[in-house]
Amino acid sequence: MVSYKLTYFNGRGAGEVSRQIFAYAGQQYEDNRVTQEQWPALKETCAAPFGQLPFLEVDGKKLAQSHAIARFLAREFKLNGKTAWEEAQVNSLADQYKDYSSEARPYFYAVMGFGPGDVETLKKDIFLPAFEKFYGFLVNFLKASGSGFLVGDSLTWIDLAIAQHSADLIAKGGDFSKFPELKAHAEKIQAIPQIKKWIETRPVTPF
């Protein structure tokens, strides 16, 4: 029997999509949550392959980088698309999501108190342009699939990632008036029984 251990901070962040993959698959794993106080010592021991979180251990073997972990788990549990083309489309969306996250990072860091800058100025100048561009792309994918999922006619891991991000934005008062399709998408994905149960029972964290 394969043993899985996911190590990440006690927050959703970059570890959440992997947790939701496990939840959807009904797969047992160790959800190892590291506090900010514990992290320096863990980092010093080089337990994390690249000196950062999250990382996944599979029968003791370590895999780092959140999207690499998600792609691996998605393949294991059939959430990577039904064909090679669908998998490539999922990966293209994931890469674009990373680009968007990089563009918007100064705003998110300021909101969380981890970075400098005026939140409202960063929202206007950095976040909103990045958000509207990326979510415009997502609308195109939803329209092309016609299924309510971003790629193909079934759930993939990128649905989980985008739905969680949308839900986080909505919970903080994000304006989805221009993107009702993505609000509906988040509601659809997070109403899937396994995901709904996970959301209801997971630890409550600010991010």
UniProtKB/Swiss-Prot annotation:
Residues annotated as domain GST C-terminal: 83-207
Q: What GO molecular function terms would the record report?
A: glutathione transferase activity
* Keyword Cytoplasm belongs to the record: no
PROSITE patterns registered for this protein in UniProt: GST_CTER, GST_NTER
Q: Where is the GST N-terminal domain?
A: 2-81
Listed binding positions for glutathione are: 8, 39, 43, 51-53, 65-66
Q: Which Gene3D superfamilies match?
A: 1.20.1050.10, Glutaredoxin
The EC number of this protein is 2.5.1.18
InterPro entries hit by this protein: Glutathione-S-Trfase_C-like, Glutathione-S-Trfase_C_sf, Glutathione_S-Trfase, Glutathione_S-Trfase_N, GST_C, GST_superfamily, Thioredoxin-like_sf
Provide the reaction this enzyme catalyses: RX + glutathione = an S-substituted glutathione + a halide anion + H(+)
Short name of one Pfam family: GST_N
Can you cite a GO biological process for this protein? glutathione metabolic process
Which EC main class describes this enzyme?
transferase
Record keywords: Transferase
Q: Which family does it belong to?
A: Belongs to the GST superfamily. Sigma family.
Described function: Conjugation of reduced glutathione to a wide number of exogenous and endogenous hydrophobic electrophiles. May play a role in the detoxification of reactive oxygen species produced during pathogenic bacterial infection.
The protein in question is named: Probable glutathione S-transferase 5
Q: Which organism is it from?
A: Caenorhabditis elegans
Taxonomic classification, please? Eukaryota, Metazoa, Ecdysozoa, Nematoda, Chromadorea
